[in-house]
Amino acid sequence: MLRCVSATAMRPLVVGSKSDTEGTLTGAMIALALEHLGLPVERRLGLGPTLIVRSALLSGDIDLYPEYTGNGAFFSGTETDPAWKDAQGAFEAVRRLDAARGLAWLDRAPANNTWLIAVQGDLARREGLATMEDFAGAVRRGLIHLAASTEFVESPAALPAFEAAYSFHLPPARIISLPGGDTAVTARAAAQGISGVNAGMVYGTDGALSALDLVVMTDSRSAQIVYEVAPVVRADTLARHPEIRPALARVFATLDAATLRRLNGRIAVEGEVPDTVARRHLAERGLLG
């Protein structure tokens, strides 16, 4: 019996993540923080898009990964519920929903990485585009060609929510729909005018926006769901290792929007390795000893 308990206790904690820049960054931070606690860790970073990583967590193939509060709307099929557009409301809702599935949400980062739309700097300056109201006018004038993920185009909470809130419709012929959810691809397409694109789906904490001379359109009507990143862990794993909760709370408390943009930029723009960026950040904050 003692050997069984010991083997279970020392089984490596499997840390997963999505394949986007911020996912691999925050996944690396989780792994490093757990290793600093003296826990054995197996990394499965960059597993794939949301549904693949989520399924791995539910099946027990991984123990924890960084997820966004707003994705609870999609997990529960309640994208139109206005509660998801409030930071605290979204956190409480997803925590309650996932508790029934044997999952625990830990403390979230103070940064909203919601979906936004950014426009080429030259076009934005020439046409005076700064807000989604301005963007809607440009769409009506036939000026906009958008690069976005299939999920962004099709999800009721993404592009359709913008269209409803700002009274515009972007025809499919003026949308380049790309598989996956990597905004590094859509932002670069917009910046470089690939396939005639001059606007792209981005996230609020993307690190490449300034470097690519993209102007983010302000969502003044709060059309979008709040997406704050937090570790999600299997409840049985947390019961075995309760020290995970305070350790990761200290890590995620350091990740405000400006910090995430800077760290994401080091990876997406400067080409640094996510683990290196994560390790340096945690060391600078005194979280690795």
Positions of PLM-derived features:
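Short, well-ordered beta-strand elements
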Residues: M10-E22, L39-R44, G142-A147
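Ligand-binding "clamshell"
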Residues: S76-L106, H169, I194-V197, G207-R221
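Short, polar/charged alpha-helical segment
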Residues: T21-P40, P160, A164
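Ligand-binding pocket segment of bilobal, Venus flytrap-like solute-binding proteins
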Residues: R141-D219
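A bilobed periplasmic-binding-protein/Venus flytrap-type ligand-binding module shared by bacterial periplasmic
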Residues: W115-R125, Y227-H241
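An extracytoplasmic/periplasmic, membrane-proximal ligand-sensing/linker region
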Residues: V153-F168, P242-G289
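Beta->alpha turn/N-cap motifs
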Residues: G46-T50, G60-A73, G89-A90, S149, ...
